[in-house]
Amino acid sequence: MATFSAAYPGNLKGDPFMNDLRYPIGRFSPGPNPTPETRNRHIEEISGTPARLRRAVAGLTTDQLRTPYRDGGWTVQQVVHHLPDSHLNAYIRFKWAMTEDAPTIKPYDEGAWAALKDSELTPVDVSLTLLESLHARWTVLLRSLKPEDYQHRFTHPESGPHDLDWLLGLYSWHGNHHIAHITSLRERMGW
C-alpha cells in the first residue's frame, strides 16, 4: 500500500471527504507559504509516483484492471492511463510558466480523454513506462528550479491564476490521490 505525506490537509482527522471514495486521501488544499523542505518533499512525491503506481497495479488481472474503483468511477485501467495524460499537461504547464509571461494554459476534458479507445485498448504497462519516462524528465526540471522560479505564474481559464508552488503541490497530491483509488479498491476487494 502506498504511503502518503501528512502534509496534505485532507489527511487530517475530521476531513468530511476522507470517507468519500472519490477522495481517499482528502481533497487537495495547498499549504501556507511553501518552504524549501516542502518543495523537496513534493518533488520526491512526484519522483516516486511511477514506482508507487506500478506497485499498486502489480499482479492485477485484466478483469480487475477493468473494475471501476467506485460506482460510476473510472476503471483501474482508466486511472492508470489518466496519470500520464494529466502529468504530461502539468509538465507542459511548468514549461510554459517558465518560458512565457503568465501564460493562459489550455484545459482539457479529462473524462473525455479517459473515454477514448486508447484508455481501453492500450496495456497499462505502456502508460506505466510513459509515466516513468515523463517523471524522470519532470523531476530533473523541478530540481533545477531556483526557489524564486516557483513564483512564476500561469492562468487556468477555469480556476484562475496560480504559481508553480501551487502546481507542484497539486501534482504531488494528484499522483497519491489516484494511487489511493487503486489501493483502496484492492483493500476493499481483498486483492
Regions inferred by a protein language model and the residue ranges of each:
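A glycine-rich, hydrophobic loop/mini-helix early in the fold
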Residues: 46-74
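Acidic/histidine-rich alpha-helical segments that form the ligand environment
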Residues: 41-56, 114-151
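Short, contiguous alpha-helical
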Residues: 2-4, 8-25, 29-30, 66-111, ...
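Short, charged, low-complexity loops and linkers
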Residues: 28-44
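Acidic/His metal-coordination segments adjacent to aromatic residues that form catalytic metal sites
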Residues: 34-38, 76, 113-127, 157-166
